[in-house]
From Swiss-Prot:
Residues noted as binding Zn(2+) in the record, renumbered to the chain: C54, C65, C67
InterPro entries, per the entry: GTP_cyclohydro_II (IPR032677), RibA (IPR000926), RibA-like_sf (IPR036144)
Function: Catalyzes the conversion of GTP to 2,5-diamino-6-ribosylamino-4(3H)-pyrimidinone 5'-phosphate (DARP), formate and pyrophosphate.
GO MF entries: GTP binding; GTP cyclohydrolase II activity; zinc ion binding
Catalytic activity: GTP + 4 H2O = 2,5-diamino-6-hydroxy-4-(5-phosphoribosylamino)-pyrimidine + formate + 2 phosphate + 3 H(+)
SUPFAM superfamilies associated with the record: RibA-like
Cofactor: Zn(2+)
Name this protein carries in UniProt: GTP cyclohydrolase-2
Cofactor binding note: Binds 1 zinc ion per subunit.
GO term, biological process aspect, one: riboflavin biosynthetic process
Amino acid sequence: MPVVFVAASKLPTPFAIFTMHGFLDEATGREHVVLSLGDIADGEPVLGRLHSECLTGDALFSQRCDCGSQLEAALQAIAREGRGVLLYLRQEGRGIGLLNKIRAYELQDGGADTVEANERLGFAADQRDYAMCLPMLEHLGVKSLRLMTNNPRKVKALTDMSIKVAERVPLHTGHNPHNRLYLATKADKLGHMMGNKHQGEVPQA
């Protein structure tokens, strides 16, 4: 996959001054961003997150999901550590796009869960692809991650690309009455590790 580095700049945030790296996936035209902090190319495991774009949660404060809260918590954790990386991937709505996500929300308003809604629209439950992460991490010199995620598919995707996941760091945040069914469905149907019994597990490739 031809993913090319375009430019980098400083990005001051309330948490830290990150370096923002821009990448272009020439095959899809999608623009992806990495926020980095500190020395991440020293060979040691780097605290990191793969975060798929969620306009409603990240920018519009939606409580239908936990995405915005996870994004903020991940950046705060990296800032506390003084070293880390966050890949912001343009895969809105688990890969189905913004307008289709709104269509899925409409079905959820009628009683469907998040997986059923995607499937009724003709999509897989999760259409995301993480192949673009490899060239971005290689460009930054990152070989091993302490991955902030509840999603075992992200761990497997990285290990399948020979990116070592030294540790899975649970990211449980943003729970509220509006996303209770959504989070339960992610655990029951998508295998997300939402409970304490899963903490510290690293699935083997």
